């Protein structure tokens, strides 16, 4: 990405941008499945000559209203699930054709008010993680750029029971443009 969305896709891409920019997106997510699910993104970046580029983004995903049932399939009411995350980004050129970037992220997930079945507690989590990115301009061909990112690096995500924690969905991505 060569705009404020770079903090999401590959923070290393921020290094090649000048000035400042604000970006916003709203998407009705999976509208054929449910009409109350949506995704929102707000991103910002500003370059500082000889220092690099800072930026960040906020993400909100509303998973809509859901029906709560107990372990005997008895109706218990309705609830709404949502997730939000914020990231602070920094990117710097290594030289004229290479750059690196880093995101520090904090996320909050609200899946349900209470535990399910015999579980006690709330179905929420607060977690942190990091993304790292690298970009190489003119890789193999003058007009071919290479991007590499590793996202969601951090500790396990735990809701009610830390013994049932799950790893963050860490991804290694390669891209060409």
Predicted features, each with a name:
Residues 1-177:
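Subset of outer-membrane beta-barrel
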């Amino acid at each position: 990405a060569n705009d404020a969305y770079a903090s999401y896709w590959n923070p290393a891409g921020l290094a090649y941008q000048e000035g400042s920019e604000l970006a916003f997106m709203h998407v009705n997510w999976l509208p054929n499945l449910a009409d109350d699910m949506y995704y929102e993104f707000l991103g910002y970046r500003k370059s500082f000559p000889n220092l690099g580029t800072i930026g960040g983004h906020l993400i909100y995903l509303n998973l809509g209203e859901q029906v709560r049932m107990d372990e005997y399939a008895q109706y218990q009411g309705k609830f709404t699930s949502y997730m939000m995350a914020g990231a602070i980004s920094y990117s710097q050129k290594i030289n004229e054709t290479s750059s690196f970037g880093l995101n520090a992220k904090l996320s909050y997930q609200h899946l349900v008010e209470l535990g399910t079945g015999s579980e006690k507690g709330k179905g929420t989590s607060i977690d942190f993680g990091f993304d790292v990115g690298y970009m190489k301009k003119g890789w193999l061909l003058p007009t071919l750029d290479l991007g590499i990112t590793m996202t969601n690096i951090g500790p396990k995500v735990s809701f009610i029971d830390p013994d049932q924690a799950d790893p963050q969905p860490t991804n290694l991505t390669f891209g060409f443009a």
